[in-house]
Amino acid sequence: MVSIVVEASNGFCSIACLENNKVLSQRNMECSNNLSAIILQEIDNCLNDAGKSKKDLTEIIASNGPGSYTAIRVVAAICKTLAYTLKLPLKVASSLKLQALLEFESNKLIVPLIDARRNNVFAAVYKVENKKLIEVLQEDYYSLEELNNFLKNNDEQFVYVGRDIKKLKEKLLLAENNKNEVSAANVVKIYDSLEIVDSYNMKPQYLRKTEAERELENDKNK
């Protein structure tokens, strides 16, 4: 079983090639402004690093959000196209869950988050039990106040993960050190929980409507 894993939900792209759930290669890079221009080449580069090619692939694994709308759409389009043209199964993984896996060995609550602007975040809270991620607070679109109140009212220690923590640190509760950059290779830790989706109908998990959709609704309600 040879897999390519693609994650690029928040200005950072991570691509990994796995064989029988073991990491053969991984490429990580900033991609805030050029994801669509580099992603196909970087997938090829990752496969080359692993000594593989597209014809060796047996499945595609895509991070399907939440995060940057543009990045999520690009990853979805590329992975759906690869799965369809190569006639391969497509699996999806939550970008927040992939972030949480950076602290998979932690005995604290794990709080992955992505800045959603205007004092809001995409976030979830997990804990690890029996080497499995257990959802304590479901992934969703929260105000920072809502997330902070949840953590305040919980007696357990916690740790944040995510590259937006520095930007939001003055608005977050005190927590211990955090890890920032998501790793596509970490999908091996939740591989058995991934489900195959219909590559034609696979939809990114935005968790909220785009600004254009919100403006259109506002115009209709005027």
What are the residue ranges of the model-derived segments?
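Surface "functional belts" at beta-alpha junctions
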Residues: 22, 89-182, 211-213
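Gly/Ser/Thr-rich beta-alpha loop segments that engage phosphate groups in nucleotides
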Residues: 13, 65-69, 73, 117, ...
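Residues at secondary-structure transition points
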Residues: 30-38, 69-73, 77, 178-182
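Acyltransferase
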Residues: 175-222
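DPxDG-like acidic metal-binding loop motif
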Residues: 59-95
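Conserved hydrophobic/aromatic positions in well-ordered beta-strands
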Residues: 16, 124-126, 205
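N-terminal beta-alpha supersecondary unit
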Residues: 1-64
